[in-house]
Amino acid sequence: MTSNLTKTEIKMLCLENGIENFEFFNFCSINKSVNIYWSNPDKECLTKNWVFVLNDNENRTLKCLVIPPNSISEIQLKTRKDKPYKLDIQIDSDNVNLRDTRSGIFFGRWLIKTISY
């Protein structure tokens, strides 16, 4: 059974599990047809204390990434062609290192907690 959490519910679960002090917060859920976590956050996230949550609503887990400001430069990631102020992140859900298939960056280095719900 899948569970679709709202952004507010995910934020609350993060706070309840000690993940706080974020300046930029976003989440995405797995696109099961391609096994990709797909996200298009604003580029400003790169200069903020960024909490990026990957929601596996089938297995009911949240992978919580905390990415410090300026850990990734804008040129390391791909942007959307139609909205160049947005990043185009596609993380392979089958890759234990959470590799972005577009840029090759491994997001797993910023994984600090997995929360079951």
Outline where the language-model segments fall.
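Nucleic-acid endonuclease domains
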Residues: 2-117
